[in-house]
Amino acid sequence: LSFRDIHGQPVQLQDYLGQPVVINLWATWCPPCRREMPVLQAAQEKTPDVTFVFINQGESTLHVQHFLAAQELSLDNLLLDSNAHMGQAVSSLSLPTTLFYDAEGRLRNNHLGELSKASLNHALQSIYKESL
């Protein structure tokens, strides 16, 4: 699948192969998504050997930029999926959905709903174990 980053540049998910990847499907209108963003941002900062990819589902660049500024969030690898193709591809029925891939690109875990710090840490351990 191919997406656009916040600057309009095309990005493909296979560009992130080579280390564990956490993909978070989210939207600004989703209260659990909004609540878990600080947890994900903190994990992104504390685990540089894991790539965090945030794929917004169906919203405009401007809307997402305003949300990030208002919430004072700094997310790496922020992608826009204007037609929610990723959600369809992984059969996500609701948001947020978080997918955990090992360094070879194999799905090792997924989480539907809001992630707590503890549940995120547990899922991260599972992709580390699988990558060893």
Locate the predicted segments by residue.
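Small/polar loops that bind or transfer phosphate-bearing groups
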Residues: 25, 55-56, 112
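Thiol/disulfide oxidoreductase modules built on the thioredoxin-like
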Residues: 67-74, 80-128, 132
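Hydrophobic beta-strand anchors of alpha/beta hydrolase catalytic cores
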Residues: 22-23, 52, 98
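Structural microenvironment flanking redox-active thiols in thiol-disulfide oxidoreductases
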Residues: 34-71, 82-88
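A short beta-strand-turn-helix
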Residues: 1-21
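Active-site acidic short loop of glycosyltransferases
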Residues: 17-19, 49, 73-75, 92
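Conserved redox-active cysteine motifs that mediate thiol-disulfide chemistry
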Residues: 17, 25-42
